Regions:
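Formylglycine-dependent sulfatase
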Residues: 1-171
Length: 171
């Protein structure tokens, strides 16, 4: 994204931005997504800022980074009742205790909440008419925040997601 501005792109970022100095990241800040990852509860998101950014100039390409804070401790977003702790199959890297089962339930609820946000963002892109000619990348920053996962060199700590969607280019 650093070099896209000089190539004629509008570059914007919404959500979690933990970079300094701001002058090294010449992105337009877009409101609507919580920049704080440990607020309880996380602020509800609002799509108006990204919708306005996407629609501003149909002739100029854009790069929009939406840095979602979910899933992140304290895992307060979403409906954890959909994931009863006693019925969960825990990954083998997570200790099976009542506390980890309860926490994993909240973690899954936040992932579901985040998935809903991604769907709303994609729907906003579709409504603005940019769905067919926009490369969408989805990635995560680290493994889950369970003991032995984040902050380790094991696969559960460093494995991240990367999904790409670009109609008629990537299948």
């Amino acid at each position: 994204p650093h070099h896209l501005g000089s190539l004629g792109y509008r570059v914007g970022i919404a959500g979690k931005v933990h970079v300094k100095p701001a002058s090294a990241f010449p992105f337009e800040n877009i409101n609507g997504f919580d920049p704080n990852c440990v607020r309880n509860p996380t602020q509800e998101h609002n799509l108006n800022g990204i919708r306005s950014f996407m629609q501003r100039d149909n002739k100029q390409p854009f790069c929009l980074i939406v840095a979602l804070v979910e899933p992140h401790v304290p895992w307060v977003m979403g409906d954890s009742s959909k994931y009863p702790p006693s019925k969960l199959d825990l990954p083998p890297t997570i200790a099976d205790t009542p506390r980890t089962r309860k926490d994993f339930s909240k973690y899954l609820a936040e992932i579901t909440y985040m998935d809903g946000q991604v769907g709303e963002i994609l729907n906003t892109l579709k409504k603005t008419g940019g769905e067919k000619d926009t490369l969408v990348l989805f990635t995560s920053e680290q493994g889950s925040q369970f003991p032995g996962n984040k902050w380790t060199n094991w696969n559960t700590g460093i494995h991240t997601a990367l999904l790409a969607r670009w109609p008629n280019h990537i299948t």
